[in-house]
């Protein structure tokens, strides 16, 4: 797909011609300012409440009059401070409204401040990772809509447009689903610095005849919501593909592995056509049993929320997106999180969802230690995901029914190296070509 995708037609459903990222930035800045004022206000009230409470307690021995002696002072304090904070919030909202009106007058090109440039698109990916659910709730134009991308161009899912954009489309499709805070570009970033990154999709095109498609989506939404959107996207893709689709291989990095598994689960339950074509599901560094960093954030948010003085900080920590919170225990479907408190202390509601009977699954992990069996490597894994979670083989937890040949751990790598490392590609190609050999660089 790289270098061959045509720009989407203006006004088409996928081009989102009405998107105004400048307006979205202004609106988000206004929300941030309002939220900051609210946080300061809550801290002020919590801290000020302590001395008022202490003075009231000290006055109790003198009867009702003594206990109520602080009421006038507190009444005056609360009303003055409320008026000040209300004024600050109104000022912030006014500035945001004025900025939004100015942004609305920009041309379509000028309005796309972020995604028209590669670095900006990556920044938008990070923003969506942390605030995707907030962007959706507020209808913000910065919310990334799911689609197949190649740089600034989005693939239009209509048969004629697909034929023009992908004249060499084949019956074999390789779908790449990025992880948290990423975009399709993360598959091509040279994470090794001095080494050449391997574009798995382009190599699979030349080596095995796959047509690569790179997904871009908002990673701040629930994994189950991204999975639903991916399922719908693939259903349209199969229906409009220029040739009859014979095989689909899914490649998910980190959160992308959960999204891929969730999409297959939902599609199978709904009887979607596309899932019948899936033959391979690859999960690279996917936290099937959860990520320790998100567990730590959960503990921090819960602890900070325990006291009035630190509760505003707890609210900030707990403002993490729904997508991030799903990584705590590897949630894939809505039943995992629906009707549950997302900020409850280390409560796991994950369900075991079935694999596709028609597909082979492959789980790959990494450790920063060259020997993946060393205690340090097993403890911290690739810095974000432990090998036990990447394999779905936790102690006392679920154990996926894998043949050992479908599980690999790479030593001397961090989380992002799995995106385009030569040794990883050789293993992927070997599995897809039916080569049973165990290839180098695995422990």
Residue ranges: model-predicted function:
Residues 149-164, 233-238, 334-353:
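A Trp-anchored, charged/polar loop motif used as the substrate-binding/catalytic surface
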Residues 170-172, 210, 244-247, 359:
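Short coil/turn segments at beta-strand junctions that form active-site/ligand-binding loops
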Residues 151, 180, 220, 367-369, ...:
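Generic structural motif
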Residues 119-124, 128, 265-443:
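Helical cap/lid subdomain of alpha/beta-hydrolase-fold lipid enzymes
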Residues 166-169, 206, 242, 275, ...:
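Short, flexible hinge/linker loops that cap or flank conserved catalytic cores
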Residues 1-194, 201-215, 225, 422-426, ...:
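Flexible, membrane-associating and regulatory peripheral segments of lipid-active enzymes
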Residues 45, 49, 53-56, 100, ...:
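Serine-dependent carboxylesterase/thioesterase catalytic core
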């Amino acid at each position: 797909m790289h270098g061959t995708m045509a720009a989407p037609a203006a006004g088409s459903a996928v081009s989102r011609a009405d998107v105004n990222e400048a307006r979205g930035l202004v609106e988000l800045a206004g929300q941030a300012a309002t939220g900051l004022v609210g946080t300061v206000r809550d801290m002020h009230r919590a801290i000020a409440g302590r001395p008022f409470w202490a003075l009231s307690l000290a006055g109790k021995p003198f009867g009702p009059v003594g206990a109520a002696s602080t009421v006038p002072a507190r009444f005056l304090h609360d009303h003055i401070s409320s008026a000040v904070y209300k004024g600050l919030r109104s000022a912030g909202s006014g500035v945001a409204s004025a900025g939004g009106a100015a942004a609305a007058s920009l041309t379509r090109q000028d309005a796309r401040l972020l995604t028209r440039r590669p670095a900006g698109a990556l920044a938008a990916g990070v923003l969506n990772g942390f605030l995707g659910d907030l962007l959706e709730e507020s209808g913000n134009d910065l919310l990334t809509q799911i689609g197949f991308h190649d740089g600034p161009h989005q693939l239009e899912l209509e048969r004629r447009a697909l034929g023009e954009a992908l004249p060499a489309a084949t019956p074999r499709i390789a779908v790449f689903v990025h992880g948290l805070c990423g975009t399709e570009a993360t598959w091509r970033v040279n994470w090794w610095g001095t080494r050449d990154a391997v574009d798995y999709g382009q190599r699979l095109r030349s080596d095995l005849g796959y047509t690569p498609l790179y997904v871009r989506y908002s990673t701040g939404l629930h994994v189950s919501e991204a999975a639903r959107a991916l399922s719908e996207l693939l259903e349209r893709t199969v229906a409009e593909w220029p040739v009859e689709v014979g095989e689909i291989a899914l490649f998910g990095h980190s959160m992308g592995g959960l999204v891929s598994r969730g999409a297959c689960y939902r599609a199978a339950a709904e009887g979607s056509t596309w899932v019948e074509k899936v033959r391979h599901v690859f999960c690279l560094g996917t936290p099937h049993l959860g990520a320790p960093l998100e567990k730590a954030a959960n503990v921090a948010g819960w602890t900070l929320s325990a006291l009035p003085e630190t509760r505003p900080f707890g609210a900030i920590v707990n403002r993490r997106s729904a997508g991030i919170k799903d990584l705590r225990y590897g949630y894939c479907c809505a039943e995992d999180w629906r009707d549950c408190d997302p900020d409850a202390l280390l409560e796991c509601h994950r369900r075991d969802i079935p694999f596709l009977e028609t597909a082979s699954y492959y789980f790959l992990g990494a450790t920063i230690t060259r020997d993946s069996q060393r205690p340090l490597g097993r403890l911290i894994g690739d810095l974000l995901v432990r090998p036990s979670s990447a394999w779905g083989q936790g102690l006392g937890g679920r154990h996926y029914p894998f043949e050992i040949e479908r599980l690999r751990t790479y030593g001397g790598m961090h989380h992002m190296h799995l995106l385009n490392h030569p040794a990883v590609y050789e293993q992927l190609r070997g599995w897809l070509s039916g080569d049973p050999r165990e290839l180098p660089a695995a422990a």
